[in-house]
């Protein structure tokens, strides 16, 4: 079963979304840097949940979500996290884990 964790990124607006689309890696890394502590916390929370359920190797997905286009694809990040835009709740980063 997939599971979802959401975290509000208050400064993610349409300009940030546009920049992320146009130059994904650089701008996504900047977004990670700006929110590093909460991103780390959320990733650890997902990993811990998988350990509690006896599943040690989940896949991680980060969705950068906006309201304009519900199914816009994203790109792989250098962190080994597969990302995509779903644009359902503006300003959220969602991490979705799938078990191996």
Swiss-Prot record:
Superkingdom per UniProt: Viruses
Name the record gives this protein: Protein alpha-2
Source species of the chain: Adelaide River virus (ARV)
